[in-house]
């Protein structure tokens, strides 16, 4: 490996420490009292314990005791402002119809529809560390992955491999496999999968770089997750990108579990392309519109040979990728918008964009640096309580498989249970008003989100979790 592996490795983040009184309700409440981010919780609808188990549609019982919602890594909670934004959109549509495409209404929180995707891109850019022109809000994650692989995966008989992780999220795996097949190659030969060492769940940066060294001469693309969905491991995006590019490789990232969760600097890290969803940490709603990053060097449009012969990177074209100045000329001469917007295909859903703009308005009141500082302390507190609340247990009923190093994780902790405990424990947690995500065969993913979760949530969760574990052990 080259020297870049040592030079670019980030320094470790210092893990917070907690006093001997950490495992008390009073201590958790004192942390909340000093939390400068606590004001954001009131901007979300926290489901009540009663409603979380409802079997019919009900209005949120705001007067009831709140559930403990640790599932923002699967679906973020609804911001209160979403209803206002959606109503404004519906009122615009009902009152001025098609004119909503081109007319701003003074008393609306939304801009005209044709500019809404551009506005959302400007809101989202700081969250992923990009220029606004490098971000496009469009489609869904896997669709965007296919669109960008059509542009960035250009295999040849000599170089057709894709370096990826061994247990990618199934949709990513299917997309990669189908792209390889579509180009006429064998996925079993072209998919290079990197896994952890035996007995570990972490994939080291060093192993990734060694794999790049081993396969660089036959590889067309490196495509990895920013955060591994099952273990919660945060990959060293900066180092891996720089090293792979030093070997002449294109590097793409699936940031589904990283965007809105951890600080990113996609432009400065020179990432070629990335995709993400917005329904997890960005709280835009189930199946909401997704995001794509294309570095500015790949979005350039060159008119040096004249207006009729623009030069640009190959992509799958659609009318919404055309420059706004000539989009409605209908002359069938494609002139792409410069930047990521030139990779758009179809008119984006205004309903989806409306929900997203509402959710992002909360992010625009803070910064990823502030969010990550609370993540650091909130998740460290969760880890501390889980590991110290039963110190005398010589045969622990669980293992945390997420890296202990806070620089190698976001908010999520993945708790690996003993075999056969998952369903029973999950049912107990749900009955107690806790929402967490279970992943078969034996993992519960716990994600306290800094925008709406509290230290008291963490403390109460651990008490209930430990009691449920005891019952499982006795059964």
Swiss-Prot record:
A single GO cellular-component term on record: cytoplasm
Signal peptide positions on this chain: none
GO annotation, biological process: 'de novo' NAD biosynthetic process from L-tryptophan; anthranilate metabolic process; L-kynurenine catabolic process; L-tryptophan catabolic process to kynurenine; quinolinate biosynthetic process
Pathway: Amino-acid degradation; L-kynurenine degradation; L-alanine and anthranilate from L-kynurenine: step 1/1; Cofactor biosynthesis; NAD(+) biosynthesis; quinolinate from L-kynurenine: step 2/3
Residue positions, PTM N6-(pyridoxal phosphate)lysine: 280
UniProt keyword annotations, A-Z: Cytoplasm, Hydrolase, Pyridine nucleotide biosynthesis, Pyridoxal phosphate
Top EC class, one word: hydrolase
Swiss-Prot/TrEMBL cofactor(s): pyridoxal 5'-phosphate
Catalysed reactions, semicolon-separated: L-kynurenine + H2O = anthranilate + L-alanine + H(+); 3-hydroxy-L-kynurenine + H2O = 3-hydroxyanthranilate + L-alanine + H(+)
EC number: 3.7.1.3
UniProt: pyridoxal 5'-phosphate binding residues: 141-142, 169-172, 254, 257, 279, 319, 347
Stored PANTHER family: KYNURENINASE, KYNURENINASE 2
Assembly and oligomerization: Homodimer.
Protein name (database record): Kynureninase
Gene field: bna5
